[in-house]
Amino acid sequence: MFSDKMILIAGPCVIEEEETTLEIASKIQEIVAPYTDHIHWIFKSSYDKANRSSINSYRGPGLQEGLRILSKVKQTFGVEILTDVHSPEEARAAAEVCDILQIPAFLCRQTDLLVAAAETHAVINIKKGQFLSPWDMQGPVDKVLSTGNSKIILTERGCSFGYNNLVSDMRSIAVLSKMGFPVVFDGTHSVQLPGGLKTHSGGQTEFIPTLTRAALAAGAHGLFIETHMNPAIAKSDAASMLSLKTFEALLPIWNQLYQCVRSFEMAAV
């Protein structure tokens, strides 16, 4: 599905203004350009963050306007688009624009959503719930496969570890890989402190370099990275997003590590 290239799902957490979204997409494309022989970039952003901690938090522009902006990103930069969906109706609408439909971690066991998304024939990225073991992901996978759609990505984004904390178990990469689909590591949501700031989630971005390197060394097929020009003023997940400057600095490291691991795997075959 993605050949041997490293999958890089990258973009802002939520769609803000059209101009901001296009600016971020343009900068990511510029950063990724030297690595297109080795990296498969997919732009991601959400039209609705339906599970914000507070009723007063910004959720996004909504389905119709959000898809219009994502369509403009797709047309302007020629990049594949990923967004998350929350209902069968949203899945069918989003598939008209997006190449990859993401099942949010909190909804990863919702049968009707999984089946409806899969029936659009889009690629389905299932994020492993913070409450599930990696072995439990076979259930959501089977629900997608029941439709005849085998275009699946599995994303590890950490497990609940007491109150307001997550931990990343790198054994999960190996377990999920045995299911036969590309496994992506979410390097930004994995450092969240869910609800840790009362009205919104906190984060420990200083651990993103360590965890992303560990995931690639463990055999992950790619990374999911939310990034922004200035995370401090971002309208969602400000505490866990990576600045574009840091994203640019880490990309060559990720690329080299991915290529190194793949070369060892090929030599072992």
From Swiss-Prot:
One of its GO terms (cellular component) is cytoplasm. The keyword NADP does not apply. GO terms for molecular function: 3-deoxy-8-phosphooctulonate synthase activity. Pfam families: DAHP_synth_1. Its EC number is 2.5.1.55. Gene3D superfamilies: Aldolase class I. It is found in: Cytoplasm. Its main location: cytoplasm. Keywords: Cytoplasm, Lipopolysaccharide biosynthesis, Transferase. It catalyses: D-arabinose 5-phosphate + phosphoenolpyruvate + H2O = 3-deoxy-alpha-D-manno-2-octulosonate-8-phosphate + phosphate. One of its GO terms (biological process) is keto-3-deoxy-D-manno-octulosonic acid biosynthetic process. InterPro entries: Aldolase_TIM (IPR013785), DAHP1/KDSA (IPR006218), KDO8P_synthase (IPR006269). Belongs to the KdsA family. This is 2-dehydro-3-deoxyphosphooctonate aldolase. It comes from Chlamydophila psittaci (strain ATCC VR-125 / 6BC) (Chlamydia psittaci). The lineage of its organism: Bacteria, Pseudomonadati, Chlamydiota, Chlamydiia, Chlamydiales. The gene is kdsA.
